[in-house]
């Protein structure tokens, strides 16, 4: 019969260290709960995976956000016209949520994207590809809408801009890091009322390029 091993009791010093550590963690979590700062972990490829710090400001003037700034905002499902194919309403066109076809995100889902376009900038779509002419005259490509989602599903709809000027209080949210980013190419411009706060990387697995 094997000899039984009696676990050693934890030393008083070690108990104190564990207790102090638990108290410190509790204090930090409580402070974060009531502070304007939040920690979030990004798992999407639009930005490098890792830990980010959100400064919860609520709606702020879009003019105060610099180009390239990381912003967290509440996603709002865009409505698109779709023809009903079954039932008593067959043949009638009604508005339906775009994310049923592209990305199953419910309204209010927090998104983190970069500010690529601001009020006064002009958006143009040519053959599904979006370019922006900023107020200083610079022109920047913002990517092309995909015909198929990463899982192979067809993408039936994307935003189309015909030299459209971004109105006051709205911005273009995007990511030029990966072509499959789900951004303003599909769900349109973001209103300032959707803004949660600005975001700073704390620790990430890769550098943005």
Q: Can you name each region flagged by the protein language model?
A:
Residues 137-151:
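Short amphipathic beta-strand/extended segments with alternating polar/hydrophobic composition
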Residues 78-79, 123, 130, 178-180:
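Solvent-exposed loop/turn segments at secondary-structure junctions
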Residues 66-70, 119, 167-168:
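Short, flexible surface segments
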Residues 149-199, 203-207:
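Acidic/glycine-rich C-terminal interaction modules and beta/coil loop segments
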Residues 1-110, 185-209:
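Protein maturation boundaries and topogenic segments
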Residues 52-54, 72-73, 124-125, 167, ...:
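Short hydrophobic-aromatic micro-motifs
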Residues 105-141:
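Mid-length scaffold segments of soluble, non-membrane domains
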């Amino acid at each position: 019969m094997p000899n039984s091993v009696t676990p050693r009791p934890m030393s008083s010093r070690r108990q104190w260290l564990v207790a102090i550590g638990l108290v410190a963690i509790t204090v930090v979590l409580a402070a974060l709960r009531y502070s304007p700062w939040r920690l979030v972990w990004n798992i999407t490829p639009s930005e490098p995976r890792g830990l980010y710090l959100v400064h919860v400001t609520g709606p702020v003037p879009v003019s105060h956000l610099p180009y390239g700034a990381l912003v967290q905002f509440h996603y709002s499902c865009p409505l698109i016209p779709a023809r009903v194919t079954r039932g008593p309403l067959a043949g009638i066109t009604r508005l339906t949520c775009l994310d049923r076809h592209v990305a199953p995100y419910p309204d209010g889902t927090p998104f983190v994207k970069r500010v690529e376009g601001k009020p006064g900038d002009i958006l143009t779509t040519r053959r599904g590809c979006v370019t922006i002419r900023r107020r200083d005259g610079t022109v920047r490509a913002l990517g092309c809408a995909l015909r198929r989602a990463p899982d192979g599903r067809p993408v039936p709809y994307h935003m189309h801009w015909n030299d459209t000027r971004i109105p006051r209080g709205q911005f273009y949210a995007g990511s030029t890091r990966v072509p499959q980013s789900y951004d303003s190419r599909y769900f349109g411009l973001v209103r300032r009322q959707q803004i949660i706060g600005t975001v700073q990387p704390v620790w990430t697995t890769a550098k943005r390029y």
